[in-house]
Amino acid sequence: MHKLIIHGGTPLKGSINISGAKNAVLPIMAASILTDKLHITNVPKLTDVSTMKDLLRSHGADIEIIKHQDEFELIIDTKNINNFTADYEIVRKMRASIWVLGPLLTKYGKAKVSLPGGCAIGARQVDLHIAVLKAMGAEIEIEDGYINASSKGRLKGTHFVFDKVSVGATINAILVAVLAEGETVLFNCGREPEIVDLCNCLITMGADIAGIGTSEITIKGKDSLNKASYKVLSDRIEAGTYMFAAAITKGDVKICGIDYHIVENIALKLIETGIKVVPINNGVQVTYEGKLNSVDLETNPYPGFATDLQAQFMSLMTLSSGVSMITENIFENRFMHVPELCRMGADIVVRGNKAVVRGVEMLKGAEVMASDLRASVSLILAGLSTNSKTVLHRIYHLDRGFQDLEKKLSNCGADIKRV
């Protein structure tokens, strides 16, 4: 099994190009089921993307892959979909597999999808997915670990209020409603840029969607959708991760290929800590200027601070000049990186959904283990900040969500290699 060897102590300097967004491309790939052909560009090279390709192929899709140096293009032909079951062996690898449920059901009237896996950070129940589908007329049973869904004729538009904000359920509801009969109005929706990107792709395919980027989305169902070509937006979580990497190594890095407005809340939080952050053409520049203040943080649905960046921010706060309180409001089990950071000398105490971080002068290299995707990269950031050697195990988590991470960091001076 591979591991990463990190020799820290070098400030990162240079530029990093941001890849396509994992959390946008996966639902867009699922949306290909709604039409006959979808051409997607700026596709990142990630294992989760490979898993979604395998899943779509298992349903009968034909996928052409055009490889470029830094990205893929995918041409997904779904006119011969002939299998409506998403098997456990594929679905267990990735929770995003649940997003084929809506498209299969709304277009073909039936779907059987294994209850998803792929993540250790919380229960992330599918109750809201099921509730909105039932509200649109679907008949659903859960048997032997599978969601069995069917409909008699087209699903019907409805008015539906999500009990709590759910990115995943918002996506599935949108994917269903674009082919449902009549008008659907969804309340308390997720507002994430990746949801906006999915909606923009669906509009390119001929969907009628209003209220994009707000908590109230109105969709008028169409009889069918068109072939289309679409470029996926850049990954704000990857961008934020490298912004924190620049800060924790006392570096100066240009983050390129990202719209400033979708990382502005990250930039503002960094500015609070004393880091200089300025917009540049097609990106943002992050510069350490000699101080790192402790700052409190709460994760919340967008436009709040992303839970997917909480672990990286915590790594930064371990070296701050005071005490910070980090509150995790999205997932109940997202402090699994804390024991590993403490192995490196961090002073962190967890109380429920809150972590109290007392800054220390320096972290120390150690052998540590990744527990999930975002926790793994937080340990890399911690390792880069030390003046010693860190060994990170179970790095297969990284490949689910970060393309060419070692290469991008090495190009900015980091001593990091996979063995």
Curated annotation (Swiss-Prot):
EC id: 2.5.1.7
Active site: 119
Family: Belongs to the EPSP synthase family. MurA subfamily.
Keywords: Cell cycle, Cell division, Cell shape, Cell wall biogenesis/degradation, Cytoplasm, Peptidoglycan synthesis, Pyruvate, Transferase
The name this protein goes by in its record: UDP-N-acetylglucosamine 1-carboxyvinyltransferase
Gene Ontology MF: a single term: UDP-N-acetylglucosamine 1-carboxyvinyltransferase activity
Annotated localization: Cytoplasm
Protein species of origin: Rickettsia rickettsii (strain Sheila Smith)
Broad class of the protein's primary localization: cytoplasm
GO BP term, pick one: cell division
Signal peptide, first to last residue: none
Known function: Cell wall formation. Adds enolpyruvyl to UDP-N-acetylglucosamine.
Residues modified as 2-(S-cysteinyl)pyruvic acid O-phosphothioketal: 119
UniProt xrefs under InterPro entries: Enolpyruvate_Tfrase_dom, Enolpyruvate_Tfrase_sf, MurA_subfamily, RNA3'P_cycl/enolpyr_Trfase_a/b, UDP_GlcNAc_COvinyl_MurA
Positions bound to phosphoenolpyruvate: 22-23
